[in-house]
Amino acid sequence: MTHIINSLDEISHHYDALFVDLWGCVHNGIVAYTAAVEALIEYRKNGGKVVLVTNSPKPRIGVEKQLLHFNVPKICYDTVATSGDSARVAMFTGVVGKKIFFIGEPRDQLFFEPISIIKSPIKIEQVSIQNAEGIVCTGPFDGSADPSVNKEDFLFGISKSMKFLCANPDIVVDRGEVRHCLLYTSDAADEC
């Protein structure tokens, strides 16, 4: 029979560490869930470690700044692991080449700053789709635009067998209302 867990404190003593999804568990994209934050603070007071995980394309430091804006205090977690940092490791080790066509918003340029855990990161050059070896996507150019705006770029990339690195596998993001996100954009390529 399945045991229903009503609160973290019922089971937390069984674990040395928690890996907790951010979006929908700790915050809703606008504000923190107070009960979740309080539960994590209490868990840490009792010696537990908390790693917040997210498929945000942002580097850890960017997510930590965003968390403060959502009223998620640093005292409720030890560190943050992001898909953005994982994708940056892949990019700076050459997975998609050195000449990159970038799909994303200008605010995501921090993605292209070398990550400290890579000793000798390759030099990345952002180029047009015609001159690219690979495509890196942190999100649509415009989150409110129809995903088909990138269709021609995807078709060109497919025709040249370019590698595609998607830093955020979300199809949609819910911030009070649904809006397009990364994989919705790459799904446009699947339809081709």
Residue ranges of each PLM-predicted region?
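Structural motif
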Residues: 19-21, 134-139, 165
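Active-site phosphate-binding/coordination module
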Residues: 44-122
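Single conserved hydrophobic/aromatic residue that forms the stacking wall/gate
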Residues: 184-187, 191-192
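Short acidic low-complexity segments
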Residues: 5-11, 118-133
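Non-catalytic pre-domain segments flanking phosphatase-related domains
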Residues: 1-20
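Short, acidic loop-to-helix structural element flanking the phosphoryl-transfer center
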Residues: 5-8, 26-52, 59-64, 81-89, ...
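Glycine- and acidic-residue-enriched helix-capping/strand-helix junction motifs
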Residues: 174-183
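Short, well-ordered secondary-structure micro-motifs within conserved domains or adaptor modules
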Residues: 126-146
